[in-house]
């Protein structure tokens, strides 16, 4: 049986750990509230941006915009969005494993598959298994639109230079505090809907200066918005996953403290009983 001193030391150690996990849970809860607000605000904007883009693309006549033009898809770029920090359960691991399955499925379809990671954990997981084309770290601690615009510009330039023919983004969509949805979203090429003659109310729009000019502005902006939304979704999911993981860790620590305390009390009782028996035996031997 372990000594009283070692058991007491373990109890103190677990209590200190529980203090840390409780603090991390509270911090994640506070950050989650802000992250949720950002996601709720970004979703309608991203959705409306997509609707406007589809309307414009559906009414485009003549030559397609380069970002709408379909070509033989031989080179794929997969953008994997994970967190920079750990201690959030299977948040990053599950996503990266889904990415690996996707890569395996697409190997027969594409001659070349490049990987771009956003977040340190995705890079660390994938670099030992695949060649990571580019890595963007420290963008998600405080996600901002400028960072998303920079990433979008990099992606668009590579696509126009035909470094890849298709771009897919993989990220965790925030659903609830305890769950996230692994999401694959095709960024490029953008597939327009069929030509739209009029909206639901029978109104036909006239675009000024022209559909082509508007698309030149809105297509890159849409890529920026979709990447920024994915970053916000990932951050909210990360804080939710970390809060859940730290809550579970705190509960496990409390259970362990209870078991160790019981073990400590039993060991202490056994030590006292042994000591009493020795005293009684000593007294009996003196009498004898």
Curated annotation (Swiss-Prot):
It comes from the Bacteria. Transmembrane segments: none annotated. GO terms for molecular function: ATP binding; proton-transporting ATP synthase activity, rotational mechanism. GO terms for biological process: proton motive force-driven plasma membrane ATP synthesis. PROSITE patterns: ATPASE_GAMMA (PS00153). It is a peripheral membrane protein. InterPro entries: ATP_synth_F1_ATPase_gsu, ATP_synth_F1_gsu, ATP_synth_F1_gsu_CS. Belongs to the ATPase gamma chain family. Produces ATP from ADP in the presence of a proton gradient across the membrane. The gamma chain is believed to be important in regulating ATPase activity and the flow of protons through the CF(0) complex. This is ATP synthase gamma chain. The lineage of its organism: Bacteria, Pseudomonadati, Thermodesulfobacteriota, Desulfuromonadia, Geobacterales. The gene is atpG.
